[in-house]
């Protein structure tokens, strides 16, 4: 994430990464209405080992405390639990994006300039606390 990890070929850092925020339950409702499969993982979906779930009542299995903390270290599998992911098959409707978080004023301006003039324009905010 800081362009220095030996196992990653990406060296661009976090600045160009956008965070798209949406309401989890609205997305699930949309997916179910449109026969789109969805799932979430209890850890990083890109790892060799992960567990996934696909029922609303299983959301309680997520370690919400780990997900919400700004710390990546500590016991009880915090690092793994923090990497839980929500996945949706094929596509995601742009109109469900409620906010875009960016790292810097430069990226903020680039994103604002790229949003469609006549369409859905979710608010864009510099959210440094969303980055590490």
Identify the meaning behind each predicted range.
Residues 1-132:
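Active-site-proximal loop/hinge segments that shape catalytic or ion-binding/gating pockets
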């Amino acid at each position: 994430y800081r362009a220095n990890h030996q196992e990653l070929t990406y060296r661009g850092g976090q600045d160009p990464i956008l965070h798209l925020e949406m309401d989890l339950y609205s997305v699930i409702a949309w997916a179910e209405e449109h026969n789109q499969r969805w799932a979430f993982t209890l850890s990083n979906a890109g790892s060799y080992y992960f567990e996934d779930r696909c029922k609303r009542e299983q959301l309680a299995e997520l370690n919400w405390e780990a997900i919400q903390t700004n710390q990546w270290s500590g016991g009880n599998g915090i690092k793994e639990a923090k990497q839980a992911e929500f996945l949706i098959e094929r596509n995601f409707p742009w109109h469900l994006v409620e906010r875009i978080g960016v790292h810097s004023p430069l990226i903020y301006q680039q994103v604002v300039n790229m949003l469609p003039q006549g369409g859905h324009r979710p608010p864009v905010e510099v959210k440094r606390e969303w980055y590490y």
